[in-house]
Amino acid sequence: MKIAFLFLTLDNINWHYYWDKYFDGHNSKYSIYVHPKYPEKVTVPWMKKNIIKNLVNTEWGIIVKAYINLMEEAMKDPKNMKFITISESCIPYQSFDNFYNFLKKDNIKTSYIKSLPIKSYDWKERIKKQKNYKDIKHWRKHLARFCLSRYHVQILLQKKEELKLFYKMHVADEFFLSLLPSSKFIKDFSVTYDNWDYIENEIKKINKKIEKLYIKLENEKVNNNKNKINNKINDYKSLKAKISANPKSYIKVYKKDFNDVNNSKAFFWRKFPKNSNINNFKNKILEKI
């Protein structure tokens, strides 16, 4: 059994030396496939030599076709039995052996997809705006980082017509696995830890501030002051929309953050931008992988 690592990036992965250590000594157990937005900027050797030929334009929220192209290329190797999506801000957090053995203990058909609740906004602004959305019998929302079995990738790639709906749908990377039938071979588990709890708490704080401003607005008599309050409300709404688009970005990492990822049992961790201080904990991470 081999694991196909599907890297979807802008150019280089942000923290490649963690991956250097992760892959070291396991050559026969993995394959690498890379879809960069800017292939000419890729300099990491193991990424550069594994860039797939069929590249497509990507932007935030529009990446499903790139995922499919990565899967199609990875399926050419019959030894690839598991397919995991990796972003540029992701680092490994457990050893390769730990992940490999975790995958082997379940049925070979098993995929790991973390489900999310479909909110009213999703139905209104994303799903129902698709012309043929009713053709999808059972909509599923999920994290965009997942690990699929060869069994499920085969099913997915056979649905060429149905996939077209997701190529232009915004944030379809959180919905396109709706094409997979419900199955005992799908486990509700995220192999990659994203800190959405932090974002939810920040949104709650913003909502409280907005609520207080609305109360203040009701009691305000001066029009000029009303305009100022409305501007503040709109600023908070814009901030809420901005931060709700992504999980926490770890520019500053603290010791307590490790408790969260440890409790999740995940094998990978994100998001770490290039200006993160994650290297303050370099030895701690290298010891784990």
List each language-model region with its residue ranges.
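ER/Golgi luminal nucleotide-sugar-dependent glycosyltransferases, focusing on the catalytic module
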Residues: 1-289
